[in-house]
Each structure stands twice: as C-alpha cells, then as structure tokens.
C-alpha cells in the first residue's frame, strides 16, 4: 500500500492519485490565512498555533517572510461539529474547511500527517481528506467508586483527551462527597480554584468540561427550596465558566414515599420534574448549555414504566446515559441499541464502564484489554457519544481508552487487531509493543472477555507444564522489559502487579522443582494477596493440582 494512505488510514475519505509537490529542503514554511475568524496572537490558532512543527512551520498571514505554502481556513456551517475538509492542490495551495475550532485542529493534524520527508526533501501530497468523527461526544467520565483521581491526574487526562481526538471530560467521582453525599454544600475556595484550573486546561485542549452532580439519594422533590439549593450549587460552576452539566440519578433507591408519592405518583414523573427544573434554570442562566442525565434504570435492554414516563416528559435536547444492557456490559450489540433507541427517544451517550475496576474484587486486577464487543453502528441509533469510565489507575487506563478513541473517531475503519498494536506503540514506543502485548494478554478485562484463554485452560487441566512454562517465561520476560520503560507514573501504578508477578514466578519455579513445602508456603501467602495477575496461572495450577489447600 502507498505510504500516504498508510499514514492517513484513520480518516474516512482520502483521495490521492500519487501527485506531490516536492521542496528541496528539510522543513517548509506555511502562511496561515483564516476567513473564519481573526486571531489576535499567533499562539491562539487551534492545533498548536504557530509553534514549531517537525516539517512545517506556520506563520501568520501578515508575515513578511517568504513561505512555501499558503493555508486558507474557511468556515462552512454545513459541516458537522469537529469535521473538516482538507484539499492540498498542486504548488502552494492548501484549503482547510471546518465549522468549529476542533475541526480546524483536526484538519491541521491531518495536514501534518500527510507531509513527509524523503531524501531530505519535504513532500506535500496533492490530496483531499474529508472526515467526520463517528461520535460528536468522545471522552472520559471519572465516575468510579473509590479514591478519586488526584488533580494532576485530571489535568493529565484532559491533555491526553485533546491529544487523541477526544473532546469530553466529565467530573463525577462517586466518592467526592460534595458531588454526591453532601451535594447541598458549596465547594470551598481551594476546590473552586482546582475546578478553574481544570476548566482552563480543558479550554486549551479544546475539551468540553462537564460538572456532574448526584442529589438523588436524599433530595426532597416536593420542596422548592431543595431545587433552589441544587441550582445554587450549579451556579458555583456557572460562575467560573462551566456550561456542560450532568444530573445523575443512578445507584439510588428511587421508590417514592410520603408527599413525593402523593404529588408525583411514580419515580419517572418525579425525576422528569427535577430534570426539567434544572434544564430551565440552565437555559435561563446561559445562552448555551448542555445537560445529560443518568436515569436510575441505566443498564437495561427492555422498556419500563419508569423509562416511558421519564423519556416522554423530558425536553428533547436532554441527553440520556445508557451503560449498555448491563452495568458492566460484556457487549453492546446493534440489536440492543436499536431497541433502546425506540425507548429513549433522546440523544444517547454510552456511559461505558470500561476499563473501570471498582466492582467487588475487581480492584485486585488490572483491566488492560482492547475495546472489545462494541457495535460499530451505535451512531446509527441515536448514540451521540461514548464516555469511558476508567480505573482508579489513570495512567494504565490510557491503554484501553486510547484504543476506544480510535473507534470513536472512525468507527467504520476500526480494526481491533491493528488498532491495538497502534495503541501500544503510541503509548510506549515500538520497542515495548511486544512486551506490552504479552502483559496485557494476561490482564484482560474479565467484564468484556474471559481472562483465561482456552489453550491455557486446557494446559491447566492436562497439567501441561511445558506450555504453561513457556507462557509464564514470556510473561516474566515481558515484565522485566517493561520495568525499563521510562514512565515514572506507569512504573508507580503498575508496581504492585509487577511484584505479584515476581511472587507468581517464584511459586511456579517451586512447582517445577516439586518443592511441595515451598509451594504450600508461597501458595498460601498468595491466596491472601491484595492484587493478582488476571490469568493467575501459578496459583490456579497449585490449587487445581491439589498442591495448596
């Protein structure tokens, strides 16, 4: 395949006949002229401004320097948000059309990917690229139970999202008490400063920042002042510039009692009332706002009185979360979303609980799988977005989320095998791809796929020590290689599982040596360990073979 098509394979439409403009230099200069908006300072241009790039240096339209190409940026209201149309013509002309800043940024990224160096000459292919991201909303919801992320992790997450063509960060940590349990209380000044910093980071990365609140456990639906307290809590966020909000009514007892039951009759009508109050408030306070809600019945694939009453009584613009047919969905097939689209009648956002590991004993594990078992056709049935709920280990969550980003960006072109290789290479570099692939294959997300493949199950049942030894030797070597990866955050988060692998390998060596006393000692210790490798081969073998009680 031609190298230009290889570099641009993640874009939906690429037309290239093999013609190029060749410049006898190792870097070219481009003049940027926008008919879309006027930029006061060069660094305000989306996509990195006029900062130095590898092969292309952008200069403002009023530059007096000699340039090699001219990039003309135009606005087209008919293009979808985040879409772009890029045309590179013979000679010096580049036309980039978009309908928002992100579209401009993504078009500039495509231009940079198209340009390449050959024999110390810059080659600019003559081509046309048209791309519309498969989902308007693409990102992360910090919505897990357990210790919330640090402020630095959130900043890093926002940076990661912007770098990987995602555009949404949702703040919804279940154990932020002021977001859920103590929702009536205002945030202190220092916390507001953190939100302001997150908002600035989001704006710089062209990421939409959502503030989510969860009052459903104890809000009194019949008291107007309760709604007022909730509105004033949201006003704290409005005052610092937040315009995207979520009202979460998940994981609550939604059966009505007393006055609430007398007034509303059913939880669907009570929830619709509250949502409409918040929706109206946001519309009055802001010229532009967005509201997404999480219903209490967020994980079904069938209709109900609750969903009927809720969906029929909400303003049409309100978006609804759905996790798929289960809270931790093993799969989200086309048939299920087709059914739910007939039930919701509202724009739907998939709250995908992957790679989150906060359920039951999942916290002992790492979930490091590709983005398995999701329909590529979700956007054909009213799904406007996908947000991933990550692990508390943000750094390690980047693997699955980086892979998800590729489907969100271009669902028809998503190839699970090649995209996973690209994800691993993007994260760690080509030197570590093989080792990462081995380690992640032993730490699959058990909520999406069986963590123990058939060949290893059979090896355990048949006491096939040779095959098991080969697999464990490869895993041990992969861990040793990954220990040299110069990413301090990666090493800190993964250290407990590397330590567990060392202990597992000691147990395996004792099994091979038929040192039964040592096997019992090590196996008994590992039974009570706080973390474990997903395949858990040595301890499983010791238990299955009767070597450890």
Question: Where do the protein language model's features map onto the residues?
Answer:
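Catalytic cores of large soluble enzymes that bind and process phosphate-bearing ligands
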Residues: 43, 47, 51, 99, ...
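Aromatic-lined carbohydrate-binding surfaces of glycoside hydrolases
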Residues: 141-321
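A generic structural motif
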Residues: 61-75, 170-174, 321-324, 351-354, ...
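Catalytic-core regions of glycoside hydrolase
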Residues: 116-119, 143, 243, 255-414
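Short, well-ordered loop/turn elements at secondary-structure boundaries
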Residues: 90-91, 136, 165-166, 344-345, ...
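Contiguous, structured surface segment used for ligand recognition
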Residues: 1-135
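C-terminal functional modules
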Residues: 4-5, 82, 409-549
